[in-house]
Structure formats: structure tokens, C-alpha cells
Amino acid sequence: MKNFLVHDEKTKAEMLDYLNINSVEDLFKQIPDAVKTNSLNIENAVSEMETQKRIKSLAKKNKTEYISFLGGGVYNKFIPACIAQVAQRFEFLTAYTPYQPEISQGTLQVMYEFQSMICELTGMDISNATVYDAATASAEAVLMSVRITKKYKALVSNKINPQYKSVIKTYCWANSIEIEWFNDIPLNTSGYACVIIQNPDYYGEITDIKQVDTLLIAVVDISTLSVLKPPYEADIVAGDIQGLGIPMEYGGPHAGFIACREKYLRQIPGRLAGRTADADGNQAFCLTIQTREQHIKREKATSNICSNQALIGLCGTLYLSLLGKNGFYQAGYLSAKNAHELSKRLADKNIKTVNKNFFNEFTIEVKDADRFLANLKSKNVLGGIKIDDTHILVAATEMTTEDDINAYVENIPS
């Protein structure tokens, strides 16, 4: 992630071979040795993320911050500094919906690039240009499946985020859709509009996605797809992009997304940016398939969400562009590595991890969850989210340091 260069070792080797040189140093061999400085008394270069960590570690000597192992849909992720600078430009910082493409090409192109990136990550054909968050994306996906199948029953996993479940319940109640909850997918699903699962689920468990006899909706945290394979088996993918350079900020704002197969294009909610040509034949961008939307269809629109969180989508687009494929993978790898290291250290303290397979979030079993978390909090460690009296959801990210893990393990109550 250093300097946001996306070149890996293979790419560097190909460039050196093309230039017919052996190393980067060969580019400077024309400079006389007499004028070169052999060594400088400075450390090797580090990435922006590592620099921020080092500066924050010095600032933390005042002990004013908590170490966070909270997750459950909101994560302490690394945010490149330039994201805020670009997002605050007046050209982007607007509530205006780009209905007039002739004056909105920048915003429309960002929306188009966002959709393209989501499609690449999820393996779907089409993505919208954001909705509010993963909760509304999940609920809107259920309504979308009902419009497609004309069936008013939905199978919803008990293991999805409780906040998502709450919003799904509200949407389904208002639209007379019956919900059946499950722990394991039933063998016969043909009588339902959809089966909706979360992977990894709320408790952090990674599960194999099975084929079903109806529409399959997969709810994902997009940052997990830096390492995990895309949910190709799904018909609709819903999720959140908070992990793509969006601060936690008291729980919002977030941005959700819905991606799907091309054949469901006219049922997807939210705005769609398309690429076209202007009167002179030049590439241009515009909102497309607008007959689905409320400014045309009114109460018959596929969705009545008025804001599309485009500014948050811009932040996610910038994040992916800055890190590149390799940087995005590295962030995911570090998150998983830190989580598994913490789980191992907890096991050494006889704290059991319930999960068989997990990414960066897992559930632990303790004797008294309230006492366990209170003791950690008194030591400036937010140890996780209480699930019940004996279980806690714990998350780690690329921002989790070895000192953070030590602070957690060393302050476990006896």
C-alpha cells in the first residue's frame, strides 16, 4: 500500500525486463558515484497507514482513546487522507441529483465507476449507485424478489445482522409479505420469493452458499470480498461499503448497494448511471432506465428512497482506486491475520472461539459477558459486542496492532 502503487513484484519484473535492466538502481547508473549519498540515517519507507499508526501511538500516550474490537457491521478501517479532501470538493459535495447530464459528468462518471467496481467484486452483471445502507439494501432486495416472482413469502436466515432483520420485518409488514426464519436452508424453497442469507453471517461464520429453488439473496460486507470469493451462486447481492474508507461516526452515514443478474435490470431499485455518447459522438454518462424511479413512476416505482448516498459511494470509489487490487487484498489479509492471531491468543487463555471458519470477526464463549466486557472497558479496551450472557462478537481489522491484541489478552478478567 506504500504510496498507493498498485505494481506487484511480477509487474515490476516485467517493466525491468522491457527496459532491459536488472534493477531500479540501474536507472540511475549515469549519476557519478562521487555525487551520490551512500546512506541516509533514516528508516525505510512505510505506507500512509503505518505512518498514521505510528503517529497515533505517540498521541495515545495521553490515554484518551479506546482500543476497539467492535464490529457487527461497523468497523475501524484504514482511511487514506486524500479521500476526505476529494469528497469535500464543491463539485461533489452536493445534494443535487444529476438529472441534467450536461452539467454533471463528473458525478455521473463516479457513479458509473462505483457500479463497475461493485460488479467486479460481487460477480454480478449490474449494480445500482447506492442505497442507504446494508439494512435497507437487504429489505429492498426482498421487495425486488417479490416483484420478480410474484410470491409473497420470504425465507430469511436467523443468522443475519439483527438490525438488518428489523428493517426487513418493517418492509415486509408494510407490503404484506410473510417471513419464515431458518437456521438451515430447507430442502424445498420453491414456494418462496427468495432465500436471504448473510456470508459471513452476523456471528462471523463463513458458510458455503447452496443452490436453492428460488431467488438467492446474499448479504455481504464488501470488504470481505478482498479475500473471499464472490457470491457467484446468488441472484441478488446486497451489502454495505462502510469498510471502503467510510468512518464509523456514531453509526453513519453508510452506503448500501444492490447488485444482480442482468435479467433483473428493470426490477433493481436505486439510480443507475450508464455510459453513452453525446451529440458529437464523445463518451458521456447519464442516468439510465429512469422509468423505474419515483420521479416518473411515483408510487409504482421500484423504490421510494430519495437520496442515493452518492457522496459516500464516491468515498468507496476513491478507496478502491487508491489501494488498487493488491492493496485491497492486503487490507483484507491483515484483517483476517489479526483476527486469527487474537483468536489463538484467547485460546491460550482458555477462551473458546465458537466459529469453525471466520474472516475478521468471530464469536467467543465466556462465563459472564457483562463482567468480561466491563473489565476490558475499564482498561480502555472495547472488547466486542454482547450477543447473550455467555457469548461476545469480536472483530479485528488491518488497524489492529500487536499492542492492541496484547492489551486485550492481558486484561481478560480471571
Regions found by a protein language model. Name each.
Residues 1-39:
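Compact, charge-rich alpha-helical regulatory domains located at protein termini
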Residues 15, 136-282, 346-349, 363-366, ...:
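Conserved PLP-enzyme active-site core in the AAT-like
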Residues 33, 37-112, 296:
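N-terminal entrance/gating region of PLP-dependent enzymes' catalytic architecture
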Residues 99-103, 119-139:
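Short loop-beta-helix segment that forms the pyridoxal 5′-phosphate
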Residues 116, 136-144, 314-318:
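Contiguous, well-ordered alpha-helical segments that form the cores/surfaces of helical PPI scaffolds
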Residues 127, 178-182, 354:
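General small-molecule cofactor/ligand-binding pocket signal
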Residues 244-349, 354-356:
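Active-site C-terminal subdomain of aminotransferase-like
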Residues 326-408:
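Conserved C-terminal alpha-helix-loop-beta "cap" of PLP-dependent enzymes
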